[in-house]
A protein has these predicted regions:
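Trp- and acidic/polar-enriched beta-sheet ligand-binding modules for extracellular glycan
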Residues: 348-350, 374-444
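Extracellular and analogous surface-interaction loops
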Residues: 195-196, 354-363, 410-415
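Boundary at the C-terminal end of the N-terminal hydrophobic targeting segment
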Residues: 22-29
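Bacterial N-terminal signal peptides that target proteins for export
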Residues: 1-12
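Disordered, acidic Ser/Thr/Pro-rich linker "stalks" and the adjacent N-terminal cap
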Residues: 304-360, 370-376, 396-404, 437-445
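Beta-rich carbohydrate-recognition and catalytic domains
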Residues: 29-186, 196-202, 206-243, 266-309
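Bacterial N-terminal signal peptides
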Residues: 11-22
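Non-cytosolic beta-sandwich-type ligand-binding/adhesion modules
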Residues: 73, 118-123, 214-224, 232, ...
Length: 445
C-alpha cells in the first residue's frame, strides 16, 4: 500500500522502539537461516565460531535419508555447510554436541531406525566421530550446568541424565551415572532443551505432533533440576499461518550480545502439515520481570538483527533472471530473491540454464550455488560474461558428477555483468536451486 505518511524505515524504527513485534507481512513465510530442508537445530559456539547442528530433511518418507551436516559461521549471517564425519549414513536424528573438560567433543543423537540415543566422541566439532555408547532415551541434548559445573543430557523420555563427569574416567560423558525424572505435568512430546538464567532452570520442548499444525514450543521452569517444573500457561511459539509459521518446534537457545534467540524448525508452507520438509528459523524472545518468556519477533536474518555485518553484499539480489525452463511454482526469479525457502526448479529430465543480469559490470569476489539437496550428485558449470556473448568458465563440473556441497562456493576475483549456471544432470534428473548468490565486497563493512 502507498497510503503511509512515514517512510517505511521510520515506521519500522518506531515499532521497534515501542517494543512491538516486527513480524513478516501476512502471507509471507518467515525466511529460514539456512538454504534447504534442515530440522532439529542445535547451536553451539566453540572458540570464535558458531556451529549449527541439524537433521538433514526433505527425503521421503521420513525426512532424513541424507548426510549429517553442521553449518558454521563467525558472524551469524554467512553460513557454510560441513559434513559431520563418522556418523551413520541416512539415519541420524537431532545431533547435538558439547565440549568436555578434556577438550574432546561429544555428540549425542538418535537413530531413526531403532529410536535409541547414542553418544560419539571426536577431536573437533565436525569429527570424525567414533561411536562410544548406546544411552537409550530420545532427542538427547547436552546441558552444561553453570551451577554445579556438571554436564547433563536431557531426554524426551522425560529424564535428565547426569553423565560421568570425571575427566580421568574412561567413560567420561559417555555413561549415565544418575537419572533424574523430570517432575511436572505438561504436554511433553519431544525435543527437550535446558538452559539456566538467574536462579531458574528453563526446560523447553516440542508439544503436539510434528506432522500436524499443533506442533509448538512450550517451556517450564524450576529452581533445581530435581524440579518440580512449572509449565507456562501458553506455548512460546505456535502455528501462525498469517505470518507463514507452520508447526514450529524442536528448538535450541542462542544468547548473544545480551539478547536471546530461539532456533527451531518450521514446516514448509507448500507442504504443511509435514514432518519431512522443514526449515531452520529464528525468533527473538525476552524475559519478563518474573522470569517468564515472551516472543518478541520472528527473525528473517539473524546476523542483521544483531547488527553483524557480512563482508559480502549479494549483487544478484532481485536482479533480472532468465532461464530456459522453469516450473510454474518454482520460477527463475526465485533463485535471486534472497529467500532460503523458494527455488528455481525445472521439469523432469530437463537440463537448466539460469542467467543473472547484474545490470552493469561489477567486481565479484565469490559465487555461491545452493542446490536443493546439498548431498546429492550433479553435473553443472558456472560461467561469467561482460556482454552475454563471450563466456569465461568459473567452475566446470560438467564431465564428472560432484556432490553439491563440495562445489557450493567459488572464491575468485573477476568483473562481469552476467553470471550463468548450467545444470546438465542430477540424481533427481532436473535442476533445482534455492539461491544463486553473486557476492561482492560490502562497502559498509
Amino acid at each position: 500500500m502507498n497510503c503511509c505518511f512515514l517512510p517505511i524505515r521510520w515506521l519500522a524504527a518506531l515499532l521497534l522502539l515501542a517494543g512491538l513485534s516486527a513480524l513478516p507481512r501476512p502471507g509471507h513465510a518467515q525466511n529460514p537461516l539456512l538454504p534447504g530442508y534442515f530440522a532439529d537445530p542445535s547451536i553451539k559456539k566453540f572458540g570464535d565460531k558458531y556451529y549449527l547442528y541439524v537433521t538433514t530433511d526433505g527425503y521421503q518418507p521420513y525426512g532424513n535419508l541424507g548426510l549429517t551436516f553442521v553449518w558454521t559461521s563467525t558472524n551469524l549471517s554467512d553460513w557454510q555447510p560441513e559434513v559431520v564425519e563418522g556418523l551413520p549414513y541416512k539415519s541420524v536424528w537431532a545431533p547435538a554436541v558439547v565440549q568436555g573438560r578434556n577438550n574432546k567433543y561429544y555428540l549425542y543423537c538418535q537413530s531413526s531406525v531403532d529410536y535409541i540415543g547414542y553418544v560419539y566422541v571426536g577431536d573437533t566439532p565436525t569429527g570424525p566421530f567414533r561411536k562410544v555408547n548406546q544411552l537409550e532415551g530420545f532427542d538427547l541434548e547436552p546441558f552444561a550446568d553453570p551451577v554445579s559445573g556438571k554436564i547433563y543430557v536431557v531426554s524426551a523420555s522425560q529424564e535428565i541424565f547426569e553423565m560421568d563427569n570425571d575427566p580421568a574416567s574412561p567413560t567420561y560423558l559417555t555413561r549415565i551415572s544418575r537419572r533424574i525424572s523430570v517432575k511436572g505435568r505438561f504436554d511433553f512430546t519431544e525435543a527437550p532443551y535446558l538452559f539456566y538464567r538467574k536462579g531458574l532452570y528453563y526446560l523447553l520442548w516440542a508439544g503436539g505432533r510434528c506432522w500436524q499444525k499443533s506442533y509448538n514450543v512450550r517451556y517450564a521452569t524450576a529452581k533445581s533440576l530435581a524440579g518440580p517444573f512449572v509449565d507456562a500457561p501458553a506455548p512460546l511459539l505456535q502455528n501462525d499461518e498469517a505470518h507463514g509459521v507452520f508447526g514450529p518446534g524442536h528448538n535450541s537457545v542462542l544468547e548473544v550480545d545480551g539478547r536471546t534467540f530461539l532456533l527451531y524448525h518450521r514446516q514448509d508452507a507448500e507442504r504443511a502439515p509435514t514432518c519431512g520438509f522443514r526449515f531452520t528459523c529464528a525468533s527473538e524472545v525476552a524475559f519478563n520481570p518474573d522470569g517468564s518468556l515472551k516472543l518478541v519477533r520472528y527473525v528473517d536474518d539473524l546476523g542483521a538483527a544483531l547488527g553483524h555485518k557480512s563482508p559480502y553484499v549479494n549483487l544478484a539480489l532481485n536482479k533480472p533472471v532468465f532461464a530456459n525452463t522453469e516450473e510454474a511454482t518454482h520460477r527463475a526469479t526465485q533463485a535471486a530473491d534472497g529467500r532460503n525457502d523458494t527455488r528455481w526448479t525445472t521439469g523432469a529430465n530437463e537440463p537448466g540454464t539460469l542467467t543473472i543480469d547484474l545490470l552493469r559490470e561489477q567486481a565479484v569476489k565469490r559465487v555461491e550455488v545452493d542446490f536443493e539437496y546439498p548431498d546429492k550428485l550433479l553435473t553443472f558449470k558456472v560461467e561469467y560474461s561482460s556482454d552475454n556473448l563471450s563466456w569465461t568458465t568459473l567452475a566446470d563440473h560438467s564431465k564428472e558428477a560432484i556432490m553439491a556441497c563440495q562445489a557450493r562456493a567459488v572464491d575468485r576475483d573477476f568483473r562481469a555483468r552476467y553470471v550463468r549456471l548450467t545444470v546438465l544432470n542430477s540424481e533427481d534428473r532436473n535442476a533445482s536451486v534455492w539461491e544463486l548468490r553473486v557476492l561482492g565486497t560490502n562497502p559498509g563493512r
